[in-house]
């Protein structure tokens, strides 16, 4: 009897799912539940076309005249970084094996990318974010809350599941943060991780370069302060960087005839557009920070709260403690990007929720968030409010407010600027989301639009995607009639309930566990009880 009594806890502990895995599974289900099942931007379509061109042996040349650069021989290439097209290739290859029509294969590829590839990349970014916080000495619970704050309490959530490249850039920043956090603990093998993060970011978007320059400067400063790593570690880090940059320059030369020609120059020259418009700098810089249209702090108010807390109540901890270099870096990277983007012709990033080009930067605020959640009592309430706010960003397509904006201006209903709240997502989303929920429950699908049908913005807003919840089960119900609307809502609700249960269980296990594993590796073993790893 005694032996059986002792055996039972041991067996249950072996069957226990590590809380980190539960948390990450909750993130994945959240991103899947709120995905539309398709792309919400033309950028993603161009990247898919590039991946398809590779598989067809055309070397990346595509037929679209929009947002492409034309070479002297008449071919057209996307001028975006190639990495997101690379990660689309497996889904596209699987879809091409299906015994269905070509159009169905294309839709299947989009479905796989938005429900599998994109959510997994976002979860991976958050996993390394959590690992970085643990290496910085933040407790499991505070690390978990900070990771939830980044993943669901900022504009990251919107871009984590819509097909844009922001989550892939965020993965690069997260890898860098993880590597540097290891290096701050005198672990020289953090440097290759940091180098890999920079490679991921620059291979995804050329405009990540200003951020990476600041991050590289901090990395070098830390190396000078801590002492240089061994030659083999430096060699591996340098090889990753050199190989990536060399590959990108070679791909540029193949596409556009010169290693330093990314395609942006050709595109702007062809369209006779100015790349930078410095005379608009002041207004657009302010708009990027606090405007209803694209204000970084209005679309992620939790980050505004943590900065107020840091400067008013916790300067010594945040800016003079062990994580001070990373906290200062987050502010520097934000400032550099605002200066750079505010003069850029397409500073607003096109369709999207808030300032798209700043979405990946929220990863860098994770250390500051971790410190806050360890020290304040109001953190849980602020986190709940932030998540509720961001839920509005995933109820409707990313293009919703832009269509509403164009429709209002074209009909003369109003004049829209960056400071007109009535033309912005932050003011339009609550009412439009509530209307979409009512229509979904009542079975009012709105107008069905034929594939590739061209309509005015005010007519597009009457379609099912904008009149009902933009979640893939609901879209399958209203657009393809594959299930009853209540079955679709039950499926979505089940995913939400599973998400809540998984995340609740993760934090429950952390609360019941023995003292946190100090400086744990980014591994599931770090979450097992002492003696089990």
Model regions and ranges:
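Membrane-proximal envelope and lipid/glycan-remodeling enzymes
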Residues: 1-531
